[in-house]
């Protein structure tokens, strides 16, 4: 009779042991995979930029694309200086930033000069 009284305890112990082992294997080999959240795209809402622009203090000229404070607009740096070359369109006027990608040294400057003359 004692055997039948302890039988449910033995069965319960075996079941919990088996669940623990299978839980380990499930986790180890990808069972019950947890959903990973994908990063969200940045919204196309300019309000964040507008807040930073409005909150920037500059006594001279605030560059609109880099928010750098400079004395004159043509002193504005390029947003990506490692990937862009800066050119002034005319002496003391606005500047443009041209991608360095794929051009030989000086090639971007030559193309800007040809475009300025209307030859490109």
Swiss-Prot record:
Signal peptide start and end residues: 1-20
Listed CDD domains: LCL2-like
InterPro entries in UniProt: LCL2
Name of the gene: LCL2
Keyword Signal annotated: yes
GO biological process terms, semicolon-separated: ERAD pathway
Keywords attached to this entry: Signal
PANTHER family registered for this protein in UniProt: LONG CHRONOLOGICAL LIFESPAN PROTEIN 2
Function: Probable component of the endoplasmic reticulum-associated degradation (ERAD) pathway.
Keyword Secreted: no
Organism: Colletotrichum graminicola (strain M1.001 / M2 / FGSC 10212) (Maize anthracnose fungus)
Family to which this protein belongs: Belongs to the LCL2 family.
Coiled coil: none
Protein name: Long chronological lifespan protein 2
């Amino acid at each position: 009779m004692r055997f039948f009284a302890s039988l449910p305890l033995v069965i319960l112990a075996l079941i919990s042991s088996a669940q623990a082992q299978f839980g380990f294997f499930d986790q180890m080999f990808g069972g019950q995979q947890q959903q990973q959240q994908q990063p969200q795209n940045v919204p196309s809402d300019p309000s964040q930029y507008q807040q930073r622009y409005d909150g920037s203090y500059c006594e001279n000229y605030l560059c609109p694309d880099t928010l750098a404070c400079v004395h004159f607009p043509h002193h504005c740096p390029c947003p990506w200086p490692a990937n862009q070359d800066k050119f002034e369109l005319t002496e003391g006027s606005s500047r443009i930033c041209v991608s360095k990608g794929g051009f030989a040294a000086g090639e971007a400057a030559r193309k800007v000069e040809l475009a300025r003359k209307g030859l490109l």
